[in-house]
Amino acid sequence: MLKAKILFVGPCESGKTVLANFLTESSDITEYSPTQGVRILEFENPHVTSNNKGTGCEFELWDCGGDAKFESCWPALMKDAHGVVIVFNADIPSHRKEMEMWYSCFVQQQSLQDTQCMLIAHHKPGSGDDKGSLSLSPPLNKLKLVHSNLEDDPEEIRMEFIKYLKSIINSMSESRDREEMSIMT
């Protein structure tokens, strides 16, 4: 059974924990409480399998605190990560500026492929859903960008996340197959 480690990173108060709880069907949190360091959520998704035989997959979603005071812990969090989801609040301009730092640190410096990264522009309840006006500078404009609004269309983000998990598992399966073939040859 394949086990994938996915990091949820991004600025403070961007909605990482709310999204992580929703996507893993964990408990809801009603009051804001900043994540201290990291929370690890383990889950399985029946829609994601590692091959045509329907072998299940396990996931660890690492909900990482966005405060810079945890920066010294980031190398340990990044170890053996298979994917990175950068969550930001699309309504806060400073979050857009910070995204390049998150991308550089968690994706580029870890030699992850862009396909292993997804951006989520999270819209908090009552903020409106302005999907059209978000322009990102290179290299962020090459990444998969998904808007999430748990109030108006929660299933859209769930379906996009499942697609993302499937791509991570496919990549892991292909890598494992290549490794097995190299051992046999």
Swiss-Prot record:
Gene3D superfamilies registered for this protein in UniProt: P-loop containing nucleotide triphosphate hydrolases
Major site of localization recorded for this protein: other
Subcellular location field: Cell projection, Cilium
InterPro entries linked to this entry: P-loop_NTPase
Entry keyword Phosphoprotein: yes
Gene Ontology MF terms: GTP binding
Residues with Phosphoserine modification: S137
Keywords: Cell projection, Cilium, GTP-binding, Nucleotide-binding, Phosphoprotein
UniProt family annotation: Belongs to the small GTPase superfamily. Rab family.
Assembly with partners or alone: Component of the IFT complex B, at least composed of IFT20, IFT22, IFT25, IFT27, IFT46, IFT52, TRAF3IP1/IFT54, IFT57, IFT74, IFT80, IFT81, and IFT88. Interacts with IFT88. Interacts with CFAP61.
Protein name listed in UniProt: Intraflagellar transport protein 22 homolog
